[in-house]
């Protein structure tokens, strides 16, 4: 890869800023509607006692948790550390541009999603994980009562002693159950309050 081109791509991305998930309400509302309308019963395999995976809503949860990109996992580097290190960021960009490990793309086609993926998966890097909102909602559908005047039931309550990054909270909102949670991390809790209040 031509060093001059690589430097230009690097500088262009640095000028744009870190590729956080969008925070505008139109985008968030669209993603929320996709999450709510997802047919989560398709995830449940009762015979084998398995709840499948779907990424619906994870991006919404992450959009409230910008600080998560800088949280250490053991001795691994964080995505923010890669972003702030010119040498490593260039190596990651080069892997996208050359198609080494990542799908090959020309500079003008690299998206914020591509950048987030590269920053998460760069060698020696790890990002904190999140509970899938669809899996949480499917669990609540199975194990927690719902409000039903027909059946005379009230919505059940889930207590989450370590809320994490909003996946289970979003699942509770989608499933229509009460959710009580605690989390010791102040920036995380602020993000969770924003999810709750939106």
Language-model regions: role of each:
Residues 1-51, 55-57, 73-198:
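Class I S-adenosyl-L-methionine-dependent methyltransferase catalytic core
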